[in-house]
Swiss-Prot record:
It comes from Thermotoga maritima (strain ATCC 43589 / DSM 3109 / JCM 10099 / NBRC 100826 / MSB8). It holds the Pfam family GTP1_OBG. Monomer. InterPro entries: G_OBG (IPR031167), GTP-bd (IPR006073), GTP-bd_Obg/CgtA (IPR014100), GTP-bd_prot_GTP1/OBG_C_sf (IPR036346), GTP1-OBG_CS (IPR006074), GTP1_OBG_dom (IPR006169), GTP1_OBG_dom_sf (IPR036726), OBG_GTPase (IPR045086). Belongs to the TRAFAC class OBG-HflX-like GTPase superfamily. OBG GTPase family. PROSITE patterns: G_OBG, GTP1_OBG, OBG, OCT. Residues 6-164 form the Obg domain. It comes from the Bacteria. Residues 165-335 form the OBG-type G domain. This is GTPase Obg. Mg(2+) binds at S178, T198.
Amino acid sequence: MNIERADFVDRVKIFVKAGDGGNGCVSFRREKYVPKGGPDGGDGGNGGFVFLRANPSVSTLIEFVNKRKFMAENGKHGMGKKMKGRNGKDLFIDVPVGTVVKDAVTGEVIADLNEPGKIVCVARGGRGGRGNAHFATSIKQAPLIAERGEKGESRWLELELKILADVGLVGYPNVGKSSLISRISNARPKIANYPFTTLIPNLGVVKYDDFSFVVADIPGLIEGASEGVGLGNVFLRHVERCYLIAHVIDVSGYEREDPVRDYFVIREEMKKYSPFLLEKPEIVVANKIDLIGKEELEKILKRLRDATNREVIPVSAVTGEGIDLLVSKLASIVREMKVEKPERKEEKFVKPSPVWRRLPEKFHLEVVKEDEGYWVVEGENLRVWIERFDLNQRDARLMLLQVLEKNGLNNKLKEAGVKEGDVVRIGDFEFEYRE
């Protein structure tokens, strides 16, 4: 799996907005030869939800560079004859397997889409408003009231791709990681004799007998990468999911003078990125052994083994010497670790309920003077009522005023200094105050 640098994007921000619920309908049945009429306003449809779905056929987040806003469909309004409005269509957004979804404002991790087909809801649609058929009572048989649909949820998300690989190749630039992955797998990365030839991670599938595993070639690290030197250390996020780290060292002495120092410099950069990486199983791959004498090689290998306390496998990515042993060792470790990993039970996806806020019955009201003789009634719980109902509807207005009066609206108006004839606004509705 080779991806061109221009197409490789592993971190983006997107905006998602679920659909609003449709409004309920105010309607009355008036049909010839139908003896019983009455309210028959239908409910509004629910707004569409927004889901993210892990799709194996998507490899990068490039699609989100030019399109960053995604909106699901609104629910349709209710109609007469108790006809419910159609629900808005849900929106499914495909992302690469291995995408971590975060709330862009809080940084909270919402989901880790680390398995093909895994789905997460990132914005719930609003529930449709109820039509006036729901508000008929024995006392009020012809209600002029219906609910507005709830607003759908919206949020900014940060999507971060962490490639799924079993083995991660790390090391200085130009130590032969790309040559190595092309030798052991089906990957065909760009290979050249200069630093930072590899600018993006390359993935390759390695086959060993009846077993196969994925290796990732991570762009080279250098001292100071955690401070942004070179390509920085951001690509180390793609090692976080690996079972095993293969630390590639150039032991030829031509470009890198001290392989032991190189090893610890890279380890320090890994630690600065995430101490968790140092806890992963690791083997050291001593590359370019074809460019050094046997006696000198043995001294270097001993130094590496003593200093790192790791298994060191000498190889030549050019001649192929030691490659079979390396592949055998990688396959053995990965196979063992996959067996040890408990099998994850498949989670059944359950669509959540649409957004629907209960109508509060208690209010903390504030009366604010905006101008001479002009007042505004405010309150957190009051906002739910204002958004739910059209206060130009007589019965909606009367119902709200009754609830407000129970919460001491009249006393609040007097305490604030509202006089007879002053204008009071609640939401979009204005009325003249009378004692």
